[in-house]
């Protein structure tokens, strides 16, 4: 090794040691609070799953198909949703699918609840967005497995850490697309609102957000798809659902189980994508 390389290696920046010290500090001083939060979140998620599983599967499938029709006004879509979910039930993966559905919906809802206000704020404050941008890039490019270690350390095993990891992974998408939607509103529309004496609050709620809604809804769809892509990773830290079946199939080399669970994830992804997409079934 050349002298310069030796020097650089000898004086390694202790990033790992700093990170370990930081998380050790958190666990030593806030472990009770963090575990209480995790247990509360686990209780809430488990309660949602148990509540949905109390319904007969066919009834719940019919209700989801009805919701698809209400959202998109498409009988064909409602029928496709009904048949797709019946296929999952036929594969004896209904309980796991409900667990995954709860995790995905909760993660997408939380990411939108956090990301949309941040995106609106960033759209009105360019300096804020310039500060956010490297953080968002880091959140999206950091390997998923790196998220699992600190979250597992802080929150333990269960659905709660799986949900937290998924939210962290998904938030950048909702922030970016909300920012894109608001900044893409034509200035002529905003100027027309100002000419009629609209306040900043009125401009936001009656001009900017309605114009940006298609892009924001695209952010919701992307958030759902990204949340689904995380189910296998979330299962590694105790989250249930279809990801657990995928990991079981991988560990035991069971092609049959992997194919069944994989197809169930695909069907669920298509169902959620079509139900939340603007413009399906003629809806505008």
Explain the meaning of each model-derived region:
Residues 1-102, 109, 282-284:
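N-terminal, non-cleaved signal-anchor transmembrane helix
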Residues 42-53, 94-102, 106, 129, ...:
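Alpha-helical membrane-interface segments at transmembrane helix boundaries
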Residues 66-70, 88-95, 107-136:
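Transmembrane-helix boundary motif in ABC transporter permease subunits
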Residues 96-100, 120, 131-134, 177-184, ...:
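Membrane-spanning helices that line or support transport/gating and their immediate boundary helices
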Residues 103-106, 111-114, 123, 137-169:
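Generic hydrophobic transmembrane alpha-helix motif, especially the helices
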Residues 153, 182, 227-268, 280-284:
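Glycine-rich helix-loop "coupling/hinge" segments at transmembrane-helix boundaries
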Residues 164, 168, 200-234, 256, ...:
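Transmembrane alpha-helices
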Residues 174-219, 246:
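Short cytoplasmic-facing helical segments at TM-TM junctions of multi-pass membrane proteins
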